[in-house]
Amino acid sequence: MTIELIKQLLDACYLAKRAREMLPALPEGVTSSYIQCLDVIQKLQTRGIQPKISDLSDTLNLPRPGVTRTVKEMEHKGYLRKQVSAEDGRVTYLFLTESGQALSQKYNTDYFSQLLPYLDSISEEDAACTIQTLKKFHAIMRERKD
């Protein structure tokens, strides 16, 4: 790789950040991390998994204390509810409330369904390659920082 290509890769990352900023505005007090958490919880439930904070943390590759804080905020705002396991009182499961389901429907399902036809010029292979490259680049930059 050349220095110029590294610069172009960083420029592409900036464009990706700008594309994220073009997502629809969220309601007051709702962060993008709420939307990600709702999405992960629903995906895990679809796979037959009763989601826990540790599942969110592992899936999103985020530290548990931050995820715990976000879950508490979401519960306080009425998007999630927690339920202690009947079998093991140390385990707490996460469930979307009606408000959480509506929020996820609007900002996950509906928005991305509307966006889908505009992206048909990007092949699944190109998208997968971009994702893989950005993940590798992020890992390299993170390791270099440590």
Tell where the protein language model's regions lie, with residue ranges.
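Alpha-solenoid HEAT/Armadillo repeat architecture
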Residues: 46, 61, 101, 105, ...
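Basic, amphipathic "hinge/linker" alpha-helix immediately C-terminal to the N-terminal HTH DNA-binding motif
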Residues: 86-107
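N-terminal leader segment of winged-helix/HTH proteins
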Residues: 1-32
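Terminal interaction helix/tail motif
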Residues: 109-146
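Short glycine/proline-centered loop/turn elements that form peptide/ligand docking sites
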Residues: 30-34, 66-69, 73, 123-124
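Canonical helix-turn-helix DNA-binding module
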Residues: 49-92
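N-terminal positioning helix adjacent to the helix-turn-helix/winged-helix DNA-binding module
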Residues: 5, 33-37, 52, 99, ...
